[in-house]
């Protein structure tokens, strides 16, 4: 089965670099965009959500991704996102603290 080159870069590291059969990324219209080998060259906005990757061996992996963009050129995909994590690597306590901090900041702005 055909594959494409994939490189996922988050703000703090290269998350993945290798071959991929298929990927589905969250896009602004609320859905997901599927990318297959030999996809037309383009740039796509990526929103916070779940991305799904099917590696060369056929294994599917789900990722939590932050906002960013994805570029497809000559059967190579580069995704630049704020964050990229496997669900099992997410620290639930830290995520809750960050959400509470963000909600407090929003409340402070609304009360001005």
Q: What residues fall within each predicted segment?
A:
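Helix-termini ("caps") and immediately adjacent flexible loops/tails
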Residues: 102-112
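Short structural boundary motif marking the start of a folded domain
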Residues: 2-5
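Compact, glycine-rich, soluble single-domain proteins
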Residues: 7-97, 101
